[in-house]
Amino acid sequence: MSYDGKFQVSTLAIHGGRVSDTHAEAVVFPIFQTATFEQQETGVTKGHSYSRVSNPTVDALEQAIGALEGTPQAVCFRTGMAAITTLFLATVKTGDHVIVSDVVYGGTVRLFREILNGLGVSNSSVDTSDVEAVERAVTPLTRIILIETPGNPTMKLTDIAAIAAIARRHNLLLAVDNTFLKIGRAHV
């Protein structure tokens, strides 16, 4: 089940992305607590090998989040910093520039200061509640705009639609860190 306008968020939260439990035919999808999964042969899995990589419970969660957000896919991480780090390591390279909201989590600031800057990725800390300031911060080397709204702990708001328009105009990725907003198409 995916969001197509017919279902309320509460229905999607219960049934969205529903995965059939072929293991025990449970009505509510079970939580798999195993660390490792049986393999057909060494290095050949039946779908999952190790829970730190993937497992049926996480698959079901990702499908449910995708349904709630109205997108065909979602990826769940163990922590917000794991998600942010993966985003940047997968999308930027030496010489690239990133615009970062001036109210992001301190761990994100340290990620740039202690790791990404050392890899040659520059960043500009910008008051993203000031749309014109974001536009001025874009350079030919900019690849991503990272915002957090409402900002934590300031509660400063950024106009997601306005920043998304800047990102589209310059062919940039837009990442929105979310501490306070609910899931379920909170951006609509």
Which residue ranges define each predicted feature?
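Generic N-terminal initiation segments characterized by hydrophobic and/or small/turn-forming residues
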Residues: 9-11, 58, 157, 169-170
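N-terminal "arm"/small-domain region of PLP-dependent enzymes with the aminotransferase-like
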Residues: 2-55, 61-64
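Conserved N-terminal alpha-helix of the aminotransferase class I/II PLP-enzyme fold
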Residues: 36-85, 107-114
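Residues at alpha-helix termini
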Residues: 24, 68-69, 119, 170
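Conserved PLP-enzyme active-site core in the AAT-like
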Residues: 2-3, 74-187
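Residue-level detector of functional hotspots within protein domains
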Residues: 12, 17-19, 23, 60, ...
